Amino acid sequence: MVDREELIIEKCAGKKVLHIGCCATPACKEECEKGTLLHLNLLKSASELWGLDMCREDITFLQDQYQVENLVVGDAELIDQLFPPGAFDVIVAGELIEHLGNPGLFLVGARGLLAPEGTIIVSVPNGIAFRRGLKSLSGRETVHPDHNFYFSRKTLSQMLLSCGYEMVDIHGFRMKRSEFFGAWISDLFASMFSQWACEGIIATARPSS
């Protein structure tokens, strides 16, 4: 398993980056106070950083309280209407596509915004994490109220391939914000047996030639 944020920051170093869902709504203010908001940490790594989020209130908060520039309010599914083609070296979509009504529309639009040799980094909760399998044995299912989709390593890879990408790498990762016992059990099991039983999956892909 990998450290999600360390991997993203490393892959964005010295690059022109577009961060989708940059405000981490509704946890924006809390993460800023803790120093854990990914967008603020990416500012130290990327050569140029842009952010896109639908929450105007949190965008304004980052602009006013942290003097963050290059922030755009908009819909990720309309991304190709918001930025010019080939504008970015890296697009980061962390815990985003499971919230969308049409993740394929977003991924196809994002592909056109990548520069030659550009990459997209997508992270998602793992739909087949160990704890979810345990709950299913008792007839229960863990579903976040804002999630429209769940992904596994295979289905995330297949979606990226079907949207015109080729895989660079894919890993399991621990959810740092997951403090509840079930998530800890998933990550413990993953560390002992298989990383694909852990709480999250992160993939890097590039447009297929």
Describe the role of every protein-language-model region.
Residues 1-15, 32-38:
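Conserved alpha-helix/loop element of class I SAM-dependent methyltransferases that forms part
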Residues 11-12, 43, 85, 107:
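A short, aliphatic-rich alpha-helical micro-motif
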Residues 16, 39, 47-48, 119, ...:
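Residues at the starts of beta-strands that form the adenosine-phosphate
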Residues 19, 90-96:
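A short beta-strand submotif of the Rossmann-like class I SAM-dependent methyltransferase core
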Residues 23-79:
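Class I SAM-dependent methyltransferase SAM/SAH-binding core
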Residues 30, 54, 65, 101-209:
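S-adenosyl-L-methionine-dependent methyltransferase catalytic module, highlighting the catalytic core
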Residues 51, 89, 122:
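Conserved SAM-binding loop
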Residues 81-91:
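A short acidic, Gly/Pro-enriched loop at the edge of an enzyme's catalytic core
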